[in-house]
């Protein structure tokens, strides 16, 4: 399965109804939805995942699950996104369908190369700008990091961290294949319109 160019990945937050957020993001043109809820039970994630997978299928968008390979397998999601402390990409690749999309979060070239060697489909590079989505964020990498890290891995880059309407196009110009956002959509009064505007910015 191939990652679309200039894709917008909307990640569910810790507070919104993930199914409704996914629905509005898809109506706004998101090409990928990632289910992420660190505090949810396996049962909750499974039930949400079934419904979001159906919504994504209707819109011909990709659906990936954060961390939980078992949930991704159970609902036949398009793939998973893994952090540095999660199951290695190679282990996830052995469990999932051969064409599954596997993303790995990285913050430097060493991690990026390792992700590529383990079979990642793309790397999530960040955080690019200051962000409030993490409890104790490190220093932002900046847009200048995108191209070198992507070249080191020879993989598509989805940039994340502090990305919104004002800087989305800049991130794409810096070499990212796409962007991932949380608060830029979830904190909006109109998530559908916020998504549509982000899509317009990264494709202009």
UniProtKB/Swiss-Prot annotation:
Signal peptide: none
Keywords for this protein: Magnesium, Metal-binding, Thiamine biosynthesis, Transferase
A GO cellular-component term linked to this record: cytoplasm
SUPFAM superfamilies (alphabetical): Thiamin phosphate synthase
Record's cofactor remark: Binds 1 Mg(2+) ion per subunit.
Residues given in the record as Mg(2+) binding sites: 67, 86
Annotated binding of 4-amino-2-methyl-5-(diphosphooxymethyl)pyrimidine, by residue: 34-38, 66, 105, 134
Biological process terms in GO annotation: thiamine biosynthetic process; thiamine diphosphate biosynthetic process
GO MF entries: magnesium ion binding; thiamine-phosphate diphosphorylase activity
UniProt xrefs under InterPro entries: Aldolase_TIM, ThiamineP_synth_sf, ThiamineP_synth_TenI, TMP_synthase
Cited Pfam families: TMP-TENI
Catalytic activity: 2-[(2R,5Z)-2-carboxy-4-methylthiazol-5(2H)-ylidene]ethyl phosphate + 4-amino-2-methyl-5-(diphosphooxymethyl)pyrimidine + 2 H(+) = thiamine phosphate + CO2 + diphosphate; 2-(2-carboxy-4-methylthiazol-5-yl)ethyl phosphate + 4-amino-2-methyl-5-(diphosphooxymethyl)pyrimidine + 2 H(+) = thiamine phosphate + CO2 + diphosphate; 4-methyl-5-(2-phosphooxyethyl)-thiazole + 4-amino-2-methyl-5-(diphosphooxymethyl)pyrimidine + H(+) = thiamine phosphate + diphosphate
Cofactor: Mg(2+)
Pathway(s): Cofactor biosynthesis; thiamine diphosphate biosynthesis; thiamine phosphate from 4-amino-2-methyl-5-diphosphomethylpyrimidine and 4-methyl-5-(2-phosphoethyl)-thiazole: step 1/1
Binding-site residues, 2-[(2R,5Z)-2-carboxy-4-methylthiazol-5(2H)-ylidene]ethyl phosphate: 131-133, 162, 182-183
EC number: 2.5.1.3
Enzyme kind, highest EC tier: transferase
PANTHER family: THIAMINE-PHOSPHATE PYROPHOSPHORYLASE, THIAMINE-PHOSPHATE SYNTHASE
Free-text function comment from the UniProt entry: Condenses 4-methyl-5-(beta-hydroxyethyl)thiazole monophosphate (THZ-P) and 2-methyl-4-amino-5-hydroxymethyl pyrimidine pyrophosphate (HMP-PP) to form thiamine monophosphate (TMP).
Family to which this protein belongs: Belongs to the thiamine-phosphate synthase family.
Protein name: Thiamine-phosphate synthase
């Amino acid at each position: 399965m191939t990652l679309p160019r200039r894709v917008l990945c909307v990640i569910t937050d810790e507070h919104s109804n993930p199914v409704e957020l996914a629905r509005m993001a898809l109506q706004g043109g998101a090409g990928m939805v990632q289910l992420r809820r660190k505090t949810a039970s396996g049962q909750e994630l499974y039930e949400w995942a079934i419904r979001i997978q159906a919504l994504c299928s209707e819109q011909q968008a990709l659906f990936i699950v954060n961390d939980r390979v078992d949930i991704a397998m159970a609902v036949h999601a398009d793939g998973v996104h893994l952090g540095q402390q999660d199951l290695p990409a190679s282990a996830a690749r052995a469990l999932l369908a051969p064409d599954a999309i596997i993303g790995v979060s990285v913050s430097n070239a060493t991690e990026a190369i390792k992700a590529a060697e383990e079979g990642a489909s793309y790397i999530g590079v960040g955080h690019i700008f200051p962000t409030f989505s993490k409890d104790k964020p490190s220093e932002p990498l900046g847009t200048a990091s995108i191209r070198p890290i992507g070249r080191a891995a020879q993989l598509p880059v989805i940039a994340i961290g502090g990305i919104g309407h004002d800087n989305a196009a800049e991130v794409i110009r810096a070499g990212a294949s796409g962007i991932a956002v949380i608060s830029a959509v979830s904190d909006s009064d109109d998530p559908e319109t916020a998504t549509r505007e982000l899509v317009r910015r990264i494709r202009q």
